[in-house]
C-alpha cells in the first residue's frame, strides 16, 4: 500500500513540475511586449489597459475597454490625449485585423478635425499596399520602403520619436521612417479607428 501511495505521489509531483515548466513559456504575444518603462527615466503612462482618464473620445467609434485593451470596430473616431506634446518619444502596443484602417496621429493642429493634413499620421493600414499609406509610413511625409510590413492579427509595437523637425518611426524594432519635417511643432496625440478591428493595449510617453 505504501508503495502504491508513493508511486501516486511521484506521478502527481512530475505532473505539477511539467505544468509549472510550461507556464514559463507563455507566448510573447499574450504578454505585454514592453516592460513598463521607468518613471525615473521620465516615462509617463497614458494608457495601461484599465481606464481612459487621459483621453477624450471624438467621433462615433465604439471604443470600449476589454481584456486589458481599448478596442473599436464600428464607426469612425479618435481617442485624443488631454495634454499636448512638443518633443517626445511614445511607445504603443496595438493589434489590428486585415481590414483595419487606423493610425497614431501626433502634433495635432486641430483636435476637433483630425486629418493627415493638419498633423503627422503614422499609419496602420495593411489593406492599402501603397508606400504612401501602408503600415509604417507617415502619411504625406515618409513612404514605406518595400517589402511593406504587415501588422494584421498580431500584437505589434510602434516607437515614435519627434524631436524638433526630426521624426523617427520604429515598427516592431525596425525603422520604417526617419525624416525631417517642420510643418507641425506640437499638439495632442490621437489613436484612430476608421474601419476593421483595432486594439491598443499600452501607451507610454516620454517628453524630451
Name each model feature, range by range.
Residues 23-208:
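Carbohydrate-interacting regions of secretory-pathway proteins
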Residues 2-10:
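Bacterial N-terminal signal peptides that target proteins for export
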Amino acid at each position: 500500500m505504501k508503495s502504491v501511495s508513493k508511486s501516486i505521489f511521484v506521478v502527481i509531483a512530475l505532473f505539477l513540475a511539467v505544468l509549472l515548466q510550461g507556464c514559463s513559456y507563455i507566448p510573447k504575444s499574450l504578454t505585454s511586449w514592453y516592460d513598463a518603462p521607468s518613471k525615473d527615466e521620465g516615462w509617463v503612462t497614458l494608457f495601461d489597459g484599465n481606464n481612459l482618464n487621459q483621453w477624450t473620445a471624438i467621433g462615433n467609434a465604439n471604443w470600449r475597454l476589454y481584456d486589458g485593451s481599448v478596442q473599436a470596430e464600428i464607426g469612425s473616431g479618435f481617442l485624443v490625449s488631454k495634454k499636448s506634446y512638443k518633443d517626445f518619444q511614445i511607445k504603443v502596443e496595438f493589434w489590428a485585423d486585415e481590414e483595419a484602417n487606423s493610425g497614431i496621429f501626433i502634433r495635432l493642429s486641430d483636435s476637433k478635425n483630425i486629418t493627415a493634413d493638419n498633423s503627422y499620421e503614422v499609419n496602420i493600414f495593411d489593406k492599402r499596399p501603397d508606400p504612401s499609406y501602408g503600415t509604417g509610413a507617415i502619411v504625406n511625409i515618409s513612404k514605406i520602403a518595400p517589402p511593406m510590413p504587415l501588422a494584421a492579427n498580431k500584437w505589434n509595437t510602434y516607437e515614435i520619436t519627434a524631436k524638433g523637425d526630426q521624426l523617427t518611426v520604429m515598427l516592431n524594432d525596425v525603422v520604417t521612417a526617419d525624416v525631417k519635417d517642420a510643418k507641425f511643432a506640437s499638439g495632442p496625440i490621437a489613436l484612430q479607428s476608421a474601419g476593421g478591428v483595432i486594439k491598443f493595449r499600452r501607451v507610454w510617453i516620454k517628453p524630451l
